[in-house]
Regions:
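C-terminal binding/interaction regions
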Residues: 99-172
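Short cysteine clusters
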Residues: 34, 70, 117
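Phosphate-handling active-site elements
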Residues: 46-55, 82-103
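Acidic-glycine-rich active-site phosphate/pyrophosphate-binding loop
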Residues: 9-14, 41-58, 127-134
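A short glycine/serine-rich beta->alpha loop
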Residues: 22-29, 59-68, 140-147
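DPxDG-like acidic metal-binding loop motif
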Residues: 75-83
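Polybasic, low-complexity association/targeting segments
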Residues: 2-28
Length: 172
């Protein structure tokens, strides 16, 4: 009986990850915005919803295309914040959010060389791009890095989902 339960949980987890992967890739294809795509995939998969959050994430790929914090990190941390965070000012309960969020950042940086867009881009193609510059943005698209970002969005969402599904991070 325990074996069947473990298999059902594993299958459910695998199904969740597969659906999440498909959503993350599709949303990035539609929007071209890694922050919105990662948040939207996680939000839809875990019922976190809120179109205002998606709207607020508009300028966050690389922090306004400056090569700074990767939009996938921001979108994923926003989703984790909705799961683990507090909505009242003045409470110190928000500190509980740091543990799962730091775990996400460690895992993401471990796989992609850092949490900055420039770190990820350099790891994918050996150099960085100024995506606010139209010529460099075109070069970025032509090198195929944009397509590789789809893999990063999907993996970033999986890292966040693994944390959300992990018992040791269950919200109180």
């Amino acid at each position: 009986m325990q074996e069947e339960t473990e298999m059902a949980t594993q299958n459910s987890r695998e199904d969740i990850m597969k659906q999440l992967d498909e959503k993350a890739r599709e949303y990035l294809r539609i929007s071209g915005n890694c922050a919105q795509s990662s948040f939207s995939a996680l939000s839809d998969q875990f019922g976190l919803g809120d179109s205002l959050m998606r709207k607020a994430l508009s300028p966050f790929p690389g922090i306004a295309l400056r090569g700074e914090t990767c939009g996938i990190v921001i979108g994923s941390l926003m989703a984790l914040g909705l799961v683990y965070g507090e909505d009242k000012l003045g409470q110190q309960e928000w500190v509980k959010t740091l543990r799962p969020c730091r775990a996400f950042c460690r895992a993401f940086a471990g796989e992609f060389g850092g949490t900055a867009c420039d770190d990820v881009t350099k790891g994918l193609c050996g150099r960085t791009f100024n995506l606010a510059n139209p010529a460099e943005a075109e070069e970025w698209r032509n090198t195929g890095v944009a397509a590789k970002c789809s893999d990063v969005v999907a993996r970033g969402c999986r890292i966040a989902a693994e944390i959300m599904l992990d018992e040791k991070y269950k919200p109180a």
